[in-house]
Amino acid sequence: MKLGAFSISLNVKDINVSKEFYENLGFKVFAGDIENNYLIMKNENNLVGLFQGMFENNIMTFNPGWDTSANKLESFDDVREIQKDLKKKGVKLEQEADEDSSGPGSIVLMDPDGNTILLDQHV
């Protein structure tokens, strides 16, 4: 199962303070819009999303079809195929992608400890 690029999406209290903190660790703004309270910070192949007021808990995010620079991969497992595979294995999904659609789609699941995992396909 190819899940694509991995990032952690953090619920932050003050996006400006968090931006400065991660810049001190060598991260640079890669994407996002601070005026809309979200930034994607990058340090080599490591991605950290900073989100102020958008969700309650931190989220592990995988992007099927993307590499760590948000370039489309030539070969990847579509989120709907991943969804079918997970359902066959008995994994409970909190949110499902429309199986009759194509292109962008997402699914949400929880690990055994209650950590949220988002598979968010943009291509």
Question: How would you name each of these model-derived features?
Answer:
Residues 28-70, 116-121:
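Conserved short beta-strand elements that form part of the metal-binding/catalytic scaffold
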Residues 20-24, 113:
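Structural preference for long, well-ordered alpha-helical segments within the folded cores
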Residues 23-30, 91:
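Conserved acetyl-CoA-binding loop of GNAT-fold acetyltransferases
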Residues 13-16, 54-55, 62-116:
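Vicinal oxygen chelate
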Residues 3, 36, 102-104:
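Loop/turn position at the start of each blade in beta-propeller repeats
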Residues 1-19, 123:
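N-terminal beta-strand motif that seeds the catalytic metal site of vicinal oxygen chelate
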